[in-house]
């Protein structure tokens, strides 16, 4: 076991992370709770709020910095944005292929629909994530509590399960 100290901008939490030794490969395996990202200090909700505000509301760095009141620092938010942007197309292509297989009637896949009207890969990924979440909610009752604002958190968890690696 080891301790992680994730932050939400106002306080630092202390979370126990359990780890096991894989008998097959002799590497350690950790089980992170779904509100933590690998290699990030801030909670997934905090990262998600920044990325969505930047992508969909067009929030400037000065606006985000003023709202954050110093935590997270603007340079940290910029790193999240760059990381998200560098992975967005890769994740988007996987989500679109998955939707085409599982929900071919999805409005996101309509050649005259919402998917063709977005202006960038970050916005496209967030849009596709909403449709993926809607599809998943129709299949699994456990997702009933997820809403539109949770779509980035959901897609990160889904992508981790798909082996997509790091998004932010």
Where are these regions (language model features)?
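N-terminal juxtadomain amphipathic helix
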Residues: 1-24, 28
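Short, amphipathic alpha-helical "recognition" segments used to contact nucleic acids or chromatin
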Residues: 43-58
